[in-house]
Amino acid sequence: MRDLLPNEQTLRDYIQGKILETYRASGFERISTPMLEDMENLDKSDGGDNLNLIFKVLKRGDKLTAALNSGDPKELSDMGLRYDLTLPLSRFYAANKDKLPHPFKVIQTDRVFRAERPQKGRLREFVQCDIDILGDESPNAEVELIDVTTRALLGIGFDGFTVNINDRRILRGMLESMGFAADTLDSVCITFDKMDKIGADGVKAELLEKQLPESAVNALADFIAAGEVTLDAVAARCADPAIADDLKYVLATANAMAAGRYQVAYCPSLVRGQGYYTGMVFEI
């Protein structure tokens, strides 16, 4: 958590204003949700490691006394601070979808909180800026999200960046074909996501530490060691070719729209840690 001096807040306001201007010009509408969420919702979400980083709010009065008497630590809190903006959006949309346009193109820029050890680049309180399109399952929605986001970045002076893209469905299909059980795929994906940080040997070691089938781990390690992991090679192990076709379409279209100002690339190890990511994922 940190304070902002007047000049720092002015810069933040300017950057946020430019980003919102780009998003609104493309038809996105801004919403706001409470910082506090019911613990029942937070705990039932599929937020990966973030579930261990929730700032919990103690119950009050008689409810707290009853919780203390129960001896169950989980009974002490009934609310917590949001750790991202996706869970609040899901709850918001479920409660209000009849009042919203279809598809719903939404902006969120708000503070989120994670109870982790502060370090460079990681704060316990920070601002997230999200855009989402709800109600459009076509690959054109993915293309639009990439296009609008990159235009926002270009508008505040960034260039020469790379948009990495993957689809968790393709990755999961490949992993299942290698012998990993369906109920272990999220765990395997989280480890595979660390490829850039710990390398192929580190990924293999961590998967073995998780006591996953050695034959499946070796199959994945051999696949990686064979050379560059291409989309065609991964897609060949996926049961549904339409998923790979959609990803190829998004890559080709996004590259054409980039017009050389930035790069768009397939990244086979890109997963994102949260389990609620089930389709295409991006990272810039």
Please name every model-derived segment:
Residues M1-R12, L58, A66-G71:
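Auxiliary tRNA-acceptor-end handling modules of aminoacyl-tRNA synthetases
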Residues L5, A181, K210-P213:
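Ser/Thr-centered flexible coil motifs
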Residues N50-A66, G179-L208:
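Acidic, His- and aromatic-enriched active-site or binding-groove loops in soluble protein domains
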Residues L11-S26, E37-D38, P73-L76, D84-D159, ...:
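Positively charged, Gly/Ser-enriched RNA/tRNA-binding surfaces
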Residues T33-N52, I165-S177, L270-G279:
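Beta-rich nucleic-acid/ligand-interaction surfaces
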Residues M35-M79:
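Polyanion/phosphate-binding surface patch
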